[in-house]
Amino acid sequence: MRTGYNDEEFEPKFIIAADVADINLLGKYKDIYGDKINLCIDHHISNTDYAEKTLVCPNASAACEVVYELIKILNIPLTEDITKCIYTGIATDTGCFKYENTTARCHEIVAELKRNCPVNFAKINREMFDVKSKGRLKIERAVTDIMEYYLDDKLTMICVTSDILNKMKVDASELEGLAGIPLQVEGVEVGVTIKQKDENSYKISMRSANNANVSDICASMGGGGHVKAAGCLLHGTLDEVKKQIVDAVAKGIKSC
């Protein structure tokens, strides 16, 4: 089965960025599409308004909620494929409805999806949240063993370097969703996942269990996101990056 498309297949006439709060989060596509984004559909309050037109609904639990509301306004029929995509986007953005950003409207939308299209949501939930590859389980065991604790155990940090990936022979795609692991430790207020991108570049994912505003913490380091889930990109040696994170989190926790 063939999915997706090759960049050379067509020249896009209208480009939409969904759930992308900052142009730098486009990654490798920044140089290609960065100055060509016609519309951004988002729910991050930290959106930097980089697109020609921007639709941000900060009260939405997920960007796919906003997409769903647009689909209703435009009277677009809900096909099985559309329903699967909307549900998957909502479920993943809300941690399968366990995050604080899950609203009553979020549940209403899912009920409407279920009522109007016979999609097996349980199957999607299992595939997205329960099933793990052998490589993923290896990574989870490894990062749990090397988890670091700071600020009287209020901050936990896991680091996934290129050396770890190479040693374990695990693909980088297995790293998705690791950010929730540090918060599983009792008493932790902020959990941080560091993923090495290149020699002196690290992608930071930050999660908050209580009152710490990780959006503000990450914004102080050039990033952003939600109050409970945010991220940024840091440069330097791993030790320098760790120190920068610890200092920023210490200030963020102190201001709560």
Predicted region positions:
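Hydrophobic/aromatic beta-strand patches that form the interior of the parallel beta-sheet core
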Residues: 16, 37-41, 53-56, 156, ...
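Short glycine-rich anion-binding loops that position phosphate/pyrophosphate groups of nucleotides
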Residues: 20-23, 44-46, 162-163, 197
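Hydrophobic helix-and-loop "lid/oligomerization" segment in the mid-to-C-terminal part
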Residues: 11-12, 92-220, 225-256
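N-terminal small/polar loop signature for handling phosphorylated ligands or for N-terminal nucleophile
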Residues: 1-30, 34
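Short glycine-/acidic-enriched loop or helix-start segments at secondary-structure transitions
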Residues: 25-28, 50, 203
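Short, glycine/charged-enriched secondary-structure capping and boundary segments
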Residues: 29-33, 53-56, 104-105, 207, ...
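Generic enzyme active-site microenvironment
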Residues: 17, 40-41, 91, 125
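Short alpha-helices
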Residues: 41-109
